[in-house]
Amino acid sequence: MLANSASVRILIKGGKVVNDDCTHEADVYIENGIIQQVGRELMIPGGAKVIDATGKLVIPGGIDTSTHFHQTFMNATCVDDFYHGTKAALVGGTTMIIGHVLPDKETSLVEAYEKCRALADPKVCCDYALHVGITWWAPKVKAEMETLVREKGVNSFQMFMTYKDLYMLRDSELYQVFHACRDFGAIPRVHAENGELVAEGAKEALDLGITGPEGIEISHPEELEAEATHRVITIANRTHCPIYLVNVSSISAGDVIAAAKMQGKVVLAETTNAHATLTGLHYYHQDWSHAAAYVTVPPLRLDTNTSTYLMSLLANDTLNIVASDHRPFTTKQKAMGKEDFTKIPHGVSGVQDRMSVVWERGVVGGKMDENRFVAVTSSNAAKILNLYPRKGRIIPGADADVVVWDPEATKTISASTQVQGGDFNLYENMRCHGVPLVTISRGRVVYENGVFMCAEGTGKFCPLRSFPDIVYKKLVQREKTLKVRGVDRTPYLGDVAVVVNPGKKEMGTPLADTPTRPVTRHGGMRDLHESSFSLSGSQIDDHVPKRASARILAPPGGRSSGIW
């Protein structure tokens, strides 16, 4: 808790409180960083700051489940550190972010986590937590996973089926990681693409002389995402472990997820605001820097129906969450791949624009109502991360992470006015309805009417508890009722075949009535004197009884009888 948060009292008056399951008119009173009262005609002490929310919505602060602040990736470091990244989040209406720790192969997960904490703690402006990447597998990794879950407040691990020779895990390794996640009550997050075929596709594209950003789209077709999605759901199901798919980008992958949920498999899924609102046509732009700015993986899809389809999947709960996957690079950094698209750093911005873009395309576009908007931008994340209802809901006792949202106000997005890093904005000149007027983080007003007022380091790390109910409750019950058992039967007491010279292919002993063929000499000649042929006319099968011969009187085709 902030040192002076106890002295901060806020009354949000006259607005409509929106949770994921209901909307109602109510005032909200905040004190000591906690929502104290929600209702009408509240009895509150004097000295409270009053915020007029008449005609506005009062919603839970957004939770962005995928950000990459201060991360080095593909030889480039993201332009946003934890201060500038969380500042942009708050300006956009997001009050909590989840960052990523990606250890190099053969390095310690715990050490990488501690290094990231040391970078983040003095910088963050809002609450945060961390996913930890599993980029290699060994017994030591499992032991460190347990340490992170039991002692460090981590309840999710990120894996990749792509990025061959960098982060990619084999199916057998995923199987082992899922077993560990199930045992520790953690959530396995997987980026699903067929890494082997992606690598081959990239080689083929380069061999054809394709070096520009369009090579990303060509070498990452959606069928490779769909195949990997089906495969990893199967692996998770075999280990009785939940699975969380990230960066879902295609209609095909969405259909695989929908089918798995219909079958009762515990599958959670997340897309990004970029995939749910943009298309891959940008990769074919004549301006190389424009095309490169959109390079992310999986790529944006050429099918113009994809983004609206993904938004529909968010609306019907096939997809649970929309994240930003914020990892911006400058044009200069992207230019490291100007002669080879495989060297363009993968990453786009979006932490500041996520809430407004989803409101515009989701709510204004008629795909979802304000309750579902709250679900996909905040409440579902809180439930999955085991933070609900402390976060993701406006009720007494919850953390005072609150946004006063104006559904009628508009803004035009531009790189020239953005707070987030980078010299490009994917949504340049996009006009959005839905604007955060006031952002309250941990009980303090940090953004109001265009003015940011929060110092770095005022955020806090939020430890995440294992075994979240929304993820594990069904699986725990299934383990009790569907436990695999062996069959209780009478032991077999008969003879058992003995294997001679194991490892060598043994020829079986021929039966008595099986003709044997003499050994062929070198050069292909047979010893005729060793043949089974006999001048007496006797044959090897003469002892087998023969049927009596019968003369067939009918002509070919059968006997016919005349009419006359």
From Swiss-Prot:
Keywords: Cytoplasm, Methylation, Phosphoprotein. One of its GO terms (cellular component) is synapse. The modification Omega-N-methylarginine is found at residue 559. GO terms for biological process: negative regulation of dendrite morphogenesis; neuron differentiation. It comes from the Eukaryota. The modification Phosphoserine is found at residues 532, 538. NCBIfam families: D-hydantoinase. PANTHER family: DIHYDROPYRIMIDINASE-RELATED PROTEIN 5, HYDRANTOINASE/DIHYDROPYRIMIDINASE FAMILY MEMBER. Homotetramer, and heterotetramer with other DPYS-like proteins. Interacts with DPYSL2, DPYSL3 and DPYSL4. Interacts with MAP2 and TUBB3. This is Dihydropyrimidinase-related protein 5. Its main location: cytoplasm. The keyword Cytoplasm applies. CDD domains: D-HYD. Pfam families: Amidohydro_1.
